[in-house]
């Protein structure tokens, strides 16, 4: 809670920063992608709580990284750090800065090192990647000082910090596509003409059902919910066959992975074109997994992975239909409206009177009312379902 400050290289070290592009050209891309993904994954992790005087104190794991990995001087006073860099709301690990750094890797990195997978990861490797991410933060600050774009700033702040419940996304999509969409008689006669069997179209195009798709994503989200509060010191790239070889539906899972993956070189052109758009992570949202071409895959972040439950799924469904079919997703909005109506009806219970959508206006010029209403005595609450995306096709 409160304002959180992202630190730059100059804030932490107070000395000239290394040349970012030159340093990127020297490092092993395969190793760097692994470290970036791992550091993003532990950005919100806490150390084991300290118990003192009948209370528990939670300390961000980031504090240990400041001390043990970067070796930042604590300047102890009465046993407590006086260096402001150790404040809990001053951060050296940032989702946005690491994703920007990842774009820089795709632009300026040495792609020949993607095949060099026989490496170890040391404390200095972690320190180097964090330092370069801090250089990125300085570069962003310099750019904003010269030319600050309020729209881009609000855009990125909203999308990165708005974190809807993943469980809510899963349940919503399952209810809409796994329940309501099964039978067009769930809808009024005037809506049935817009009906599309999205689950059948999805299965035909991708070879997996929407339910199987969501089950795969749930499995891949598990590592982000673990209690692991330490660095691995090994690659977090995972071998596809080793992970899924014992699965009954291995082939189906691999099909799901292929619809959500890209090789780093496939994202190069997008990264170049959007280098100056600090808010644009569309490429990572289209492909939340990276493939190294040697049978290994890497989840970029929990942020990009959770997006696959909603916005990414929407566009996968859209791709099941011709681009000329302008009404392909009209029924998708009807599904969302019905979902909101059912939620509102359930919320009414015995305390409120539920009123469904109805026609208003003169005969021949009718319009539909809001999607649902809740009434209690002489008070009326109107409920109108509106969905939107702050990015384009992700």
Per-range role (PLM):
Residues 1-334, 338, 342-346, 350:
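Acidic, metal-dependent phosphodiester-chemistry machinery of nucleic-acid enzymes
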């Amino acid at each position: 809670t409160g304002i959180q400050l992202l630190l730059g290289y100059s804030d932490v070290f107070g000395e000239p920063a290394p040349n970012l592009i030159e340093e990127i050209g020297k490092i092993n891309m395969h190793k760097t992608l692994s470290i970036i993904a791992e550091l993003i994954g532990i950005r919100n992790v806490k150390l084991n709580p300290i118990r003192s005087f009948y209370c528990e104190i939670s300390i961000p794991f980031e504090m240990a990284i400041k001390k043990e990995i970067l070796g930042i001087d604590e300047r102890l006073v009465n046993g407590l750090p006086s260096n402001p860099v150790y404040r809990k709301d001053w951060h050296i690990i940032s989702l946005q800065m690491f994703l920007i750094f990842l774009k820089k890797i795709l632009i300026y990195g040495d792609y020949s090192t993607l095949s060099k997978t026989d490496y170890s990861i040391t404390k200095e490797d972690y320190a180097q990647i964090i330092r370069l991410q801090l250089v990125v933060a300085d570069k962003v600050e310099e750019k904003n000082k010269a030319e600050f774009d309020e729209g881009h700033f609000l855009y990125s702040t909203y999308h990165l910090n708005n974190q809807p419940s993943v469980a809510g996304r899963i349940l919503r999509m399952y209810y809409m596509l796994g329940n309501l969409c099964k039978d067009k008689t769930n809808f009024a006669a005037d809506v049935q003409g817009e009906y599309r069997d999205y689950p059948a179209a999805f299965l035909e195009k991708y070879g997996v059902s929407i339910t199987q798709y969501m089950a795969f994503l749930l499995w891949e989200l598990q590592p982000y919910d673990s209690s692991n509060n330490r660095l691995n010191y090994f690659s977090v790239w995972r071998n596809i066959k080793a992970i899924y070889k014992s699965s009954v539906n291995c082939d189906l899972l691999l099909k799901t992975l292929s619809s959500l993956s890209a090789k780093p070189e496939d994202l190069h052109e997008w990264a170049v074109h959007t280098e100056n758009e600090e808010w644009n992570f569309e490429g990572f949202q289209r492909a939340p997994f990276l493939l190294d071409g040697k049978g290994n895959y890497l989840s970029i972040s929990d942020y990009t992975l959770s997006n696959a439950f909603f916005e990414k799924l929407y566009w996968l469904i859209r791709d099941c239909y011709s681009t000329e079919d302008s009404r392909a997703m009209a029924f998708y909005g009807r599904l969302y409206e019905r979902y909101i109506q059912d939620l509102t009806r359930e919320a009414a219970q015995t305390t409120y009177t539920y009123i469904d959508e109805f026609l208003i206006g003169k005969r021949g010029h009718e319009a539909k009312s809001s999607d649902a209403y809740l009434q209690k005595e002489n008070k009326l609450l109107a409920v109108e379902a509106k969905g939107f995306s702050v990015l384009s096709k992700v």
